[in-house]
Amino acid sequence: ISHDRLEQRVAASEQSLRSSLLLLRNRARQLSEKGELLTPMAESILAVLAQYGSFNAAALYPVDSEGRLKGKPLAVMGEMSSLDSNDLLVQMCLEKGDVVSVRETIIEQGKDASLSSLQACVPLIDAEDRLLAVVAIKSMPFFAFNDRTFSLLALLGGHVADLLQSDPKALQLASLDAQHFSQHLKRARLDAENHDLPGSLMFVELSLENEPLLKALQDSQRGLDLQIQLRNGRSYAGVMILMPLTDAEGVLGYEKRLQYLLTERFGQGVSLDSLEVRVHHHQLDPKGRSTGLHDFLYIECGLNDQQMAI
């Protein structure tokens, strides 16, 4: 099941997936300056997962760097007895890095259900495949015991793990889109610094309001690129484009593609110049220095640190 389809299914519930994650993100913003987020957010995380999984007895356990349960639970709801670290479902969840249930254990694998005191386990695994915690579920109603619920819990677990690993500066940004963009920019900078991979930024600044042009820019987006619409300190609308794995030659190729699209949409002779558009470029520094990027974003493009964190 795709993430989009899952979000559509959840949208009919009292709180959509996005609004639930927004609540967690706001909590994370409040705590981000104080260090790690898992411990102080554990109860909130368990409550959100319980809302979608309908379970009434569960606990959230941290996982160490070796992939083992670490100490006591950080949050508990309902009647939960102490958990055996050798519990079958826990071990399967840690090994697979995915949601496991007692139904799957018994029916699909022929395991002995008496080897577990649980009904299901949900891992919190981020986009970098780091396992941060496990939610051990002891009791959930029969109506919730289905693939849809488990798929949704897996999706939520991944989103929550990404949030827990968020860069503190990015968490302070005003919008989810800005946070998402800044985290991808951080990753592109690390790729440049650690792996000598190219990366480019391009800011298209519109001197005049032009919705059809903004739509054309949106439609010009390539597969790996990321775009965000912003209004800078000069009160001009613009689009910041992150181009991972793209050098200066690749940027020229993108600009040719964009020019072709402009001709197609607006007619021969129309260019960014004729539309009174300024284009700003920046190549990510392979040595990881941020001075040039700082000047590009905050001086040349006229943005502020609430719109873009570095």
Regions found by a protein language model. Give the residues of each.
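Active-site-proximal structural segments of metal-dependent nucleotidyl cyclase/transferase enzymes
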Residues: H184-L206
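Short beta-strand-to-loop transition segments that serve as allosteric relay/switch motifs
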Residues: V134-F143, M243-T246
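Conserved helix-loop-beta segment at the catalytic/binding core of cyclic-nucleotide signaling proteins
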Residues: L214-G250, Y260-G269
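A short, aliphatic-rich beta-strand micro-motif
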Residues: S117-D126
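Regulatory loop-to-helix N-cap segments in sensory/regulatory domains
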Residues: G110, K138-L153
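Signal-transducing coiled-coil linker helices
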Residues: R29-I45, S175-H180
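Signal-transmission linkers at sensory-effector interfaces
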Residues: S2-E33
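Regulatory sensory and allosteric helical modules in signal-transduction proteins
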Residues: V63, K70-K72, E79-K111
